[in-house]
Amino acid sequence: DLPDARPVETPAAKAESLPHNESPDPLGDPIEVDVVIPIAHVATSNTAIAPTAGRGTQVSYVAAPTNPVGSRDELDRPQWESVRTRIQDAVRESIEIEGPIALNRLIRNVVHRFGFDRAAAKRQEVVRQFVPVDLIHEDELGCFVWPSDLDRHAWTGFRTTPSGFVRPLDEIAGEEIINALVHAARNGVYDREQLMRDTLAYFDQSRLTKQSADRLELCITKAERLGKLVRRGVGYVSAT
């Protein structure tokens, strides 16, 4: 596999002028994370219509934006209304453009947009408060955030990874991998390894590493359990 890709770092945006009632706090002050907990409800009600709802089979993957939305000092002050608004907007934008998106990827992306190369635990926790709880789904295949109008049970599409872009398999929702497996087996495949390799090709990956094989094994097992893949001897065929 190719090395993990890191988003191109862009200089952090210059901090905007602060309202008269938002005087700077000392940098050493603790972050009042609890004050942003109610925002999750607001973010849920304001989640816009997601383009993923119309995604079909083999649509090209589009990553969430990485352009700056604020400065480092601002992310350390989530009690400011202007900062809360920008965090909420960045979270919503990522879900709309890239959803389903891995929760940890979503959080890291928003932290990076405030100028940080590394997403420290305390800053991840701040951003986490803004992710709508009802859009998060966690199972044995990972924790992902879904657009509000995309039914993960009914969705049959998947996104192909553009050449040269590294998209780790563990950052792809299990439902999306299963959809790709089903598509790869539409005309039948002669064995399990061929099914895995054909599916990896959709995500611009050629090496079947142990990590990739383990994740694909879980997805194949689940696809069989859901009746989406049918075993024929040592091979597989799509049930749809």
Region spans (language model):
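Intrinsically disordered, low-complexity, repeat-rich polar/charged segments
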Residues: E9, A13-A15
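C-terminal non-catalytic scaffold/interaction domains in large multidomain proteins
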Residues: L18-T240
